[in-house]
Amino acid sequence: MEEYELREIALQEGGSNLDINTPPNYDNPVGDGSSPPDSPDIQKSENQFKNVERELEIDSKQYLAGHDAENNHDENDEDFKLRRYFENSQRMALGNGQKPKKMGVSIRNLTVVGRGADQSVIADMSTPFISFFNLFKPSTWKEKGSTFDILHDITLFNRDGGMLLVLGRPGSGCSTLLRLISNQRGSYVEVKGDIKYGGIPAKEWKRYQGESIYTPEEDTHHPTLTVRQTLDFALKCKTIHNRLPDEKKRTYRQKIFDLLLGMFGIVHQADTIVGNEFIRGLSGGERKRLTITEAMVSSASITCYDCSTRGLDAASALDYAKSIRIMSDTLDKTTIASFYQASDSIYNLFDNVAIIEKGRLIYFGPGNKAKQYFIDLGFDCEPRKSTPDFLTGVTNPQERIIRQGFEGRVPETSADFEAAWRNSSMYRDMLEEQKEYERKIEIEQPAVDFIQEVKAEKSRTTPKRSIYTTSYITQVKALIVRNSQIIWGDKFSLISRYLSVFTQSFVYGSIFFQMEKTIPGLFTRGGAIFSAILFNAFLSEAELPLTMYGRRILQKQRSYAMYRPSALHIAQIVTDIPLTMIQVFLFSIVVYFMFGLQYNAGKFFIFCFTLVGATLATTNLFRVFGNFSPSLYISQNVMNVILIFMITYCGYTIPKPKMHPWFAWFYWANPFSYAFKALMANEFGDLSFDCHDTAIPFDPKNPTRYDNDYRVCASPGAVEGILSVEGKDYLDQYLHFRSDDLTQNVFITYLWWVLFTAMNMFAMEYFDWTGGGYSHKVYKKGKAPKMNDAEEEKKQNQIVANATSKMKDTLKMRGGIFTWQNINYTVPVKGGKRLLLDNVEGWIKPGQMTALMGSSGAGKTTLLDVLAKRKTMGEVQGKCFLNGKPLEIDFERITGYVEQMDVHNPGLTVREALRFSAKLRQEPSVSLEEKFDYVEHVLEMMEMKHLGDALIGTLETGVGISVEERKRLTIGVELVAKPHILFLDEPTSGLDAQSSYNIVKFIRKLADAGMPLVCTIHQPSSVLFEHFDRILLLAKGGKTVYFGDIGERSKTLTSYFERYGVRPCTESENPAEYILEATGAGVHGKSDVNWPETWKQSPELQEIERELAALEAAGPSSTEDHGKPREFATSVWYQTIEVYKRLNLIWWRDPFYTYGSFIQSALAGLIIGFTFWSLQGSSSDMNQRVFFIFEALILGILLIFVVLPQFIMQKEYFKRDFASKFYSWFPFAISIVVVELPFITVSGTIFFFCSFWTAGLNTEYNDINFYFWFIFILFLYFCVSFGQAVAAICFNMFLAHTLIPLLIVFLFLFCGVMVIPSSIPTFWRGWVYHLNPCRYFMEGIVTNVLKHTDVKCTSEDFTHFTNPEAVNGVTCKQYFPISEPLTGYVEAINEGDESKCGYCLYNNGEEYYNTLGWSFDNRWRNLALIICFWIFNTLMVITFVYITRKPRR
């Protein structure tokens, strides 16, 4: 097989005469201080080295300074400079003793087995029941589902420094092959066969993980980082140790940074944030270039690029491929790339090509022989059809052309193609060449030099067997900087968090303002300290979604061997420390002194230090559940149960002696308990609490009646005759811990933080919930297609063939003439405004397809956003008309817009998503049957019939359809709406040639039927380009280069450019690539002609302006009047029904969310029920009953955090739907509130049955039982709607988690439990207390539970005092008669002994709640008020959904 046969022809440039593949003959490692045998003259070598260094420096400056200059050099000159730069870099490296890491790949008999689609079905709420009952069905025990071969018996190889192009249609197995070459095997059932890397077996190759990397199709980056920050981080993690002499790390990183940004033309975007589908940032093409650049930073020996030209224009894609070619030639980098669409220019840069169909290898060999091989098999290639399109097209019955005389003899199925290949002489030659290559590997042993060089690249402190280049501490430092940048990148949320904390601290401080050192202040002071811990715990809830977010980025960078996952957690906790310290200090500096805690600097700093430890421990605990859990909802619900445990067993709500033994162990396994004990000891250890005015006995009418020697404080720790209680005695007797253990408890609090840190590090190292990047499909039960079945393959081919033939030429579309004039679009930037569209004008007419082209970043997507009325930011100037009239309210509805980002609701199947679009966007006069028939037609045309019942899913979880299939679904969603005008933003990006052809052919039919449409397209083949009638070509800055007809065989278009001095376009050349080259598109493209200015002076523009003036003067066209324009196709009532049905289906299919709340309620109910097991009628049990209800209140409040992520996610999908006018804001808002109700009802009922009777609250009054259940359910309705209202306001999860604690502080602090109503400051009691729904919940349910409860104090509950008048026959009751305002009763402790008396605080439950100012008579009023609060929250949801209904773009 010829090696690198097409290199010089493809690149058309010269190279260096230096043989860079021959390393210097050094026997000793570089840097050991010795010289090799027969070493040359040292001085002479140093002089030569310095000469090369100076030459490299000159070349570097020329390249790095000149890559972005305009109108100076032609394209080949730019390639020459890049080649020369790399060659000189390699010469210097060789002179420094470095050796190229030349590693090829040899694959033999590779078979990859995947799970069949029938192995798992779409999970829903019935799944657990079915699984349970299947345990009792022996017939199901052995049913494990089918498997299939994703790849079947693949044998090929790629030499070191070689470039292998892998071609195949989507689903053929190209991505799997690339993953296996990069040694990513985790997601597959079985991998059979042999892969060797330069002779190193795959098992051993794991030690060199970062030396073979896989760059996935999707672009995964932190959206708030800039390009500079993203690449700088990668460079810090991959900076090699054996750099050039005296070259500093910073210099090395800057050199590589400048080089790569110059190579890929993103120099001007260096300080632009990356962005994503929800955050504005880089364009799609620029983001793709960043992905490629990041992969190159890894400096891997073998790089696998999966569809890496997706989103790039043809010129940029060619520049990228040329850069890869040069790097492969000069640096001996081995490249394997998979492209769905590639031009001949790109194709010719590769040495070999492998073609895969349905997992089978049907060709492997030189690229220049592949076309002839298939022609010899009996296939023919159309004129102007690119070689890659032809090679993939031969496997498609609808695309391939059979040569005359070969009918019935050509292969039909993938198995036929594989058999033909294996029977060919080329296959036998390939096997011989592979054997020869493997023998060469055995002789030359490149692995020896490779291993030595890998070791030399590692930093001195990096273990030699480590897969990482830099040391652990270096990784941590880089991650600390990146984490800080991510946090500061969202500075609005950070500042909002601190402002929220500071604001809330005043609320907390005012509630417990200047607590008195009296007996009532004992419990209140403990409540203040407890609330300080609880406040920071609620803030830590934000860590759960943040832990889940970024898993895919971690998985990618982990595969690049950038850093250990545990290093990421170390960096997180390092950045946590200052942020937490600031947070706690802002909180403490206010509350400590407002609380009236001891004015002692040491105690203040102990308070802060302990709170910091408790907050850090809680934050890490939340991360533990996030890292050990596959789902946010699982971790959220489990964490809520644990949080209830921690709150209950910290020692505040239940003192340690009152804890039942079955759960008392959690007191010792609870970070909160140690923090609480430390803070209590810090405050109470040397305090005394006075009780002169409240000591027992006490006569309100005659305060001096009783002798103080016989009075006692009504508090644990009291001593008769001493009218004060020592804080340390209170801690000892009531809470059962010593104040001397302060230091120990602080230390243990931090020890928990360390333990949780270790658990997180373990989880991040050994758990990967992303599925390794492999997307696994799940189907409805019984709907999974058969895999690797020849008959099924023929059936699918026939479906597509029938769909193609059924495309009706008589389709009737309601199109119109859409014109736009003088469109300018500016956006605010730092220091002024930036013009993104500059005076763009044009039109689209029925029956015409207009192509919108230009280099990446030229403003194509921006123009479509403006024309489709999707822009909500910036300033738009200019005029748009439809049929001569200004755009009306129904424009967005009748317009189809296929956006670049594929945003779909993951809980639906493909067919359900399409039907939903058809039902809500097609005219209501069209029957449902006709709408569904059209959906099936589109499914067939999009080659998605077999995916109709597949779950859309998400890429993050690895469950759902692939990236390419999502793109097809995006197009289908718009097509089924039968729009009047169609805008398509890169509809063929990421699709193979045949899929692209089918889509373009389909929209060509729509155009022929009368639909006007405009389509941005990056890499059109000649065949695709011929389907378009007109073209609008943009240059950077949104300037028009050309707008007009393309003409037959593109003659009108090409003649325009030839008129101004561009070379003629050849017959075999792709006109789309020709015009991009002519106008200087691409990374390094340049042109001597100022095309925007040329266009302004051209006669074509004058003709365009005359035509636009004529269209405007003609006025509204006499089209059929269809009545008053409607913003939405269907009524609000119909929309509401359909949206509710969809949301209900999504909730039904999310058992993690629904069953998670059920399980949370059950566990919480059992925990709370058994914690307050069988409460009796003692005085202390009155308190326990109230705290039982308080725990139920906390459960409801915690539900707020559970609904946040679901609502925010669904709101993003709603914004996308609303922009296309699927449905109004009201149906979504009311549906998402109502859909929760049945699930909340079940959750509340579960809690009721698990806790009510367990805690001993059963009474013979059924109305009391019913009331408890009813008001609790309504309270849960309120809590969920409250969380939804907050989520409707906030635009991201972090902000919502910042705002929630500020609001819930008013809920639980002002409910009347932690601070009794009479003690609440007048300012708050006057309005917040009365506006707090939790107050009405507590009043209603407490009075309901305690109404018929009599109190009988135990010996421990009594306040003991001596009756000195007992010797005179005075009984206890006579000695201390109870009179208002006192409550309770007095009796002798021991029957017959009236000298020892006891005072019980209450006679019955009514006396208890009367002291709070509550009344049983208000219970139905309270219930009604909770309903009112719930309705108010619902109105807030509706209001804020309306206000935030439009996405920021």
From Swiss-Prot:
Gene Ontology MF, one: ABC-type transporter activity
Superkingdom to which the source organism belongs: Eukaryota
Residue spans of biased composition, Polar residues class: 14-25
A single Gene Ontology CC annotation of this entry is:
membrane
Domain named ABC transmembrane type-2: which ranges?
488-731, 1152-1386
What residues does ATP bind to?
854-861
Give the bilayer topology.
Multi-pass membrane protein
Record SUPFAM superfamilies: P-loop containing nucleoside triphosphate hydrolases
Chief subcellular location equals membrane
Bias (Basic and acidic residues) ranges: 1-10
Q: Where is the ABC transporter domain?
A: 130-383, 818-1062
GO biological process terms held by the UniProt record: aggregation involved in sorocarp development; hyperosmotic response; sorocarp morphogenesis
Region Disordered: what ranges?
Answer: 1-49
What keyword terms does UniProt attach to this protein? Answer: ATP-binding, Membrane, Nucleotide-binding, Repeat, Transmembrane, Transmembrane helix, Transport
Q: Where in the cell is it found?
A: Membrane
InterPro entries per the UniProt record, alphabetical: AAA+_ATPase, ABC2_TM, ABC_trans_N, ABC_transporter-like_ATP-bd, ABCG_dom, ABCG_PDR_1, ABCG_PDR_2, P-loop_NTPase
Give the similarity note: Belongs to the ABC transporter superfamily. ABCG family. PDR (TC 3.A.1.205) subfamily.
**What's this protein's name?**
ABC transporter G family member 21
- What organism does the UniProt record list as the source? Dictyostelium discoideum (Social amoeba)
